[in-house]
A protein has these predicted regions:
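N-terminal, post-signal peptide beta-strand-biased segments of exported outer-membrane/organellar beta-barrel
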Residues: 20-125
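Acidic/proline-rich low-complexity IDRs
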Residues: 11-14, 348
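C-terminal segment of classical bacterial N-terminal signal peptides
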Residues: 13-21
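N-terminal non-cleavable signal-anchor helices
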Residues: 6-7, 17, 216
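Outer-membrane beta-barrel porins/channels
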Residues: 22-45, 107-399
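Bacterial N-terminal signal peptides that target proteins for export
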Residues: 1-9
C-alpha cells in the first residue's frame, strides 16, 4: 500500500516553492514517503512494523499476502492508529501534525483448506497538518506564510493465498488506490493596509497496485518471509484556485512510484520467547512526477528488530522493538535523513479463544535542533482486534 507518497510530494512541492528554510520541513508531517506501507496491526507495530511474518495476525493486517494462508476459516481484523508530532525548528514559528489510519479485513476460505481469500479497506489516512513561517517584506510589512493540508487516501486490497503444505505459503494482492489531498497557502499580513493572498490546490489520485509474498519454514521454530510491492503508476487530476480567479487552472499529471521489497524472519528462541526481524528496500531515485527535485531522492532502507515474551503461557505478552530508517529523500544540502523509533506493547487473548486485542505505543525522533536546526518527536498509539472461528484457548506454537 503506497498512496501516501502523493501526500508527501504535494506538500513538499509547495514548500520548495515558497519556504525560505526547507531544512525546517516537518519530517513526520510532510515527508510521508517513509511511512506509507507501515502495518497498522498493533502486534506487528510493537514488534517493529516491518516484521511481516507474525502468525497470529493471520495476514489480515500485514503486507505479506502469504500470511493469509494460515487462516483456514472465516476471520476478521480491525485496527487503527492515531499520532501526534511535536516539531521544533530554528525557522518555523508553528508546526502541528495529526494523522490517523484505520484498516478493516475480512477473510474466508475459497477451496477446502488450500485457498483463502480476503477483502479489506485501508484508510481514511488523514494527515491534517499546518505550519507558519514569519517574515517581513522589503517595505517593512510583517506577515506569516501559512500552509495547511487535509484530506487523505484509501485503498481496497483483494488477496488470495495458497497453503502449499507444511513448509511454504504463497499469496498475491491487487489493490485499488484512490484519494483526495487538499493543500492551502495563505500569506497573512499583519498590517491594515495590505491584502492577504490565498491559493488552494486539490489533487485527485488513482492507481492500481499489485503485491506478492512467500513464507517458508525451513526448520522447526524458524520462519522466513519475502514480499514484493509493484511499481505504482498514478493518475493525478489537479485543480488550482487563487485570490485572482483569472489565474485558476486545472490539469492532469502522472506519477510513478518505485517497487519495494520486504524480508522478514521469526525465530522461537525458547519457550514463550520469540525474536522477529525485518528489512525493506526501495530505490526512490526511480521516482517520477510532481516536479520533485531528483537530486534530493535516494534509496530507502529500513531495519527492525522485535522481541515477544509470554511468561508461562500468560495471556498478556510483553513486546518491544527498535527500528532504524533511512528515508528516501535528503535535505537541500544533500544531508541524509534518518529516523529512529522504539515501540512497546501487549495484548489479551480472550478466554473464548476466538479473538484477541492488541495495543502498542511507538516513540520516534528525527534530527536535533542543536545540530540540524530541526527536530521531530512522534508518539503513535495503535490498537487492533482480530478473531477467527478456528482459534482455541491453546496458544499457537508454530514459532
Amino acid at each position: 500500500m503506497r498512496p501516501y507518497v502523493v501526500i508527501a510530494m504535494a506538500a513538499l512541492a509547495g514548500l520548495i516553492a515558497r519556504a525560505p528554510a526547507p531544512r525546517a520541513d516537518s519530517i513526520f508531517g510532510i515527508n510521508l514517503l517513509g511511512e506509507r506501507i507501515e502495518s497498522v496491526d498493533a502486534r506487528v507495530a510493537a514488534l517493529g512494523g516491518f516484521v511481516q511474518i507474525v502468525d497470529e495476525s493471520l495476514g489480515l493486517l500485514q503486507f505479506n499476502p502469504a500470511m493469509l494462508a494460515f487462516s483456514k476459516r472465516v476471520a476478521f481484523g480491525a485496527a487503527g492508529y492515531v499520532t501526534s508530532d511535536a516539531n521544533q525548528s530554528a525557522e518555523l514559528e508553528r508546526t502541528t501534525v495529526a494523522t490517523k489510519f484505520s484498516t478493516l479485513m475480512f477473510a474466508f476460505p475459497l477451496f477446502r483448506r488450500t485457498l483463502t481469500a480476503s477483502v479489506g479497506y485501508r484508510g481514511h489516512y488523514d494527515p491534517d497538518f499546518d505550519y507558519s513561517i514569519p517574515g517581513t517584506t522589503t517595505s517593512g510589512e510583517e506577515y506569516n506564510d501559512i500552509f495547511e493540508r487535509s484530506g487523505g487516501t484509501w485503498g481496497v486490497p483483494i488477496t488470495v493465498a495458497a497453503d502449499l503444505g507444511r513448509y511454504a505459503k504463497v499469496g498475491g494482492t491487487i489493490s485499488l488506490e484512490r484519494g483526495t489531498i487538499e493543500n492551502r497557502w495563505l500569506t497573512d499580513f499583519t498590517g491594515s493596509n495590505t491584502v492577504d493572498a490565498t491559493s488552494t490546490q486539490i489533487r485527485e489520485v488513482s492507481a492500481t497496485g499489485f503485491g506478492a509474498g512467500v513464507v517458508v519454514r525451513p526448520i522447526a521454530g524458524v520462519g522466513i518471509g519475502l514480499a514484493f510491492e509493484s511499481e505504482l503508476d498514478y493518475d493525478v487530476d489537479v485543480t488550482e484556485s487563487f485570490t485572482n480567479t483569472a489565474a485558476d487552472t486545472s490539469y492532469d499529471e502522472t506519477m510513478v512510484q518505485p517497487a519495494r521489497w520486504i524480508a522478514s524472519a521469526a525465530w522461537r528462541a525458547a519457550r514463550g520467547f520469540t525474536v522477529y526481524g525485518g528489512a525493506s528496500f526501495s530505490d526512490f531515485t526511480k521516482f517520477e512526477g510532481l516536479a520533485f527535485p531528483t537530486d534530493r531522492l535516494t534509496e530507502e532502507w529500513v531495519a527492525a528488530l522485535g522481541l515477544e515474551y509470554r511468561f508461562r503461557g500468560s495471556r498478556f505478552p510483553v513486546r518491544l522493538s527498535g527500528r532504524y530508517e533511512k528515508l528516501p529523500y535528503t535535505l537541500p544540502d544533500g544531508e541524509e535523513i534518518t529516523r529512529v523509533s522504539f515501540a512497546l506493547g501487549s495484548g489479551l487473548l480472550f478466554r473464548t479463544g476466538r479473538g484477541k486485542l492488541d495495543a502498542a505505543l511507538q516513540f520516534g525522533k528525527i534530527g536535533s535542533v542543536d545540530t540540524n536546526t530541526y527536530e521531530d518527536r512522534q508518539v503513535r498509539f495503535y490498537i487492533s482486534i482480530t478473531g477467527s472461528e478456528q482459534w482455541s484457548t491453546k496458544r499457537e506454537t508454530r514459532y
